[in-house]
A protein has these predicted regions:
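Acidic, metal-coordinating helix/loop segments flanking the phosphotransfer/catalytic sites
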Residues: 33-51, 68
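Receiver (REC) domain active-site loop signature in two-component systems and cognate sites
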Residues: 58
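Active-site residues of response regulator receiver
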Residues: 55, 85
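C-terminal output helix
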Residues: 109-118
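Two-component/phosphorelay signaling modules centered on CheY-like receiver
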Residues: 11-32, 99
Length: 123
């Protein structure tokens, strides 16, 4: 993976996800951070991206709205999206997957769980 966008309104969460990616060997990828869905969408439009990791609850544009925009874009439609959230529940997880999320991970996500999700994505 060459470029990964991390969208979360918490700087601490973004730093933690960045650290998880480094631990599992993706630290060489270009890791780009956004504080909300609107910033993330802007970054996704700028340059080809291999993966979007997004929080669900963010100001300005939440993760579900971002996911809808990504999946409705002809250019971004095939972009894998993992939602990482503390607001997860089975019904919400089903809803996000129906919108096109590759997976939904609960915070705090561990490097092992993130690695397993990414391995599923690659295979």
């Amino acid at each position: 993976m060459n470029r990964i966008v991390i969208a979360d309104d918490s700087a601490t969460a973004r730093m933690f996800i960045r650290r998880c990616l480094e631990i599992i060997g993706l630290g060489e990828a270009t890791l780009v951070e956004a504080e909300n869905g609107r910033e993330a969408l802007s970054l996704l439009k700028e340059e080809d991206t291999d993966l979007l990791l997004t929080d669900l609850n963010m100001p300005v544009m939440d993760g579900a709205t971002l996911l809808k925009w990504v999946k409705s874009s002809p250019r971004l439609h095939d972009l894998p999206v993992l939602v990482i959230t503390s607001a997860g529940n089975p019904a919400k997880e089903q809803e996000l997957k129906a919108l096109g999320a590759f997976g939904v991970l609960n915070k705090p996500v561990s490097p092992a769980v993130l690695r397993d999700a990414l391995q599923s994505l690659i295979s």
